[in-house]
Amino acid sequence: MAEAGPQAPPPPGTPSRHEKSLGLLTTKFVSLLQEAKDGVLDLKLAADTLAVRQKRRIYDITNVLEGIGLIEKKSKNSIQWKGVGPGCNTREIADKLIELKAEIEELQQREQELDQHKVWVQQSIRNVTEDVQNSCLAYVTHEDICRCFAGDTLLAIRAPSGTSLEVPIPEGLNGQKKYQIHLKSMSGPIEVLLVNKEAWSSPPVAVPVPPPDDLLQSPPAVSTPPPLPKPALAQPQESSPPSSPQLTTPTPVLGSTQVSEVACQTSEIAVSGSPGTENKDSGEVSSLPLGLTALDTRPLQSSALLDSSSSSSSSSSSSSSSSSGPNPSTSFEPIKADPTGVLDLPKELSEIFDPTRECMSSELLEELMSSEVFAPLLRLSPPPGDHDYIYNLDESEGVCDLFDVPVLKL
């Protein structure tokens, strides 16, 4: 048997075993992958760059790297690097990570302490508010506020929402500063309240800003009228009935309350007249006891009764009235009194009821309306309905234009 001779050396240009190893190919592939843009590498381009004839070896490398989580497949022949770059696994980063974890633990411990203190404070507030002895003292009096600001003037301001407040710089005059507060509201009035410092003093008064003109002027002195003399009672006489039937109203008699305020006793209005008195002025009162003003008490007449005027009805009513006598249920109407027995009216009252006078002064009208003689006022017209105020007025028109009321020059 012949012995084998020595093996011939490989031809020049043939790669060595080390150069064909899988470890060296993996190192070159990872370096190429890290140099790729955004870590994305095409496997065909990598095989051409590394001069790998068998792509099977490239696929073996990508399968191992994908298994340990360093790369991921983007498409069939494209992969992307996921691992950290060089210099990331240093000692400084590890120490920084340990420091951040310790800081997180400390912050969590402080958060737990704050939560515990919050629970304690809430429980303390609940204990104070729910205490029976403290519930009756849950307020502050104005004495407590004044005690805190002794020697100062306290003003309580109540203003609507949206009020603007301006406090200019105080100006010093002779060593004293002058403070000013400017309040402006577009939605409603502003009320300024002076806080009472003494409990025994009068209650505070709310004054609007600016104060009205009537508060700046002193109120007029009220004069008390002198006591009136007691009137004398007169005997009523029989009067002739009117020439035509009329709807009459009973003569008003003052109540006990009003009479007691004027003359301290009750009295009646006596009417006297003569049979020959005309019916034209039959509604006037002959005498005015207790200082009352002369009122026009003419009875109401219907238009139908005024048209049917006959002398026969007048004579028949006169005979029946004289035969039957006065009926207590019948309402007698006042007639004109004897001119000799009429009291002279004062000058003021005669000027008031003068028919030739155009109008009365506003002061005299207010005085009459405030007296007890003309109060209370009775509404003669029906109450306003839903269709009474359905008209609109221009900016240049007023209430007088709506109701056709002439403007009086008082």
UniProtKB/Swiss-Prot annotation:
Q: Where is this region: Interaction with RBL1 and RBL2?
A: 387-404
Q: Where is this region: Dimerization?
A: 86-181
Keyword annotations for this protein, in alphabetical order, are: Acetylation, Activator, Cell cycle, Cilium biogenesis/degradation, DNA-binding, Nucleus, Phosphoprotein, Transcription, Transcription regulation
Region feature (Transactivation): 334-410
Coiled coil (residue ranges): none
Q: Which positions make up the DNA-binding region?
A: 16-85
Q: Which residues carry this modification: Phosphoserine?
A: 381
UniProt name for this protein:
Transcription factor E2F4
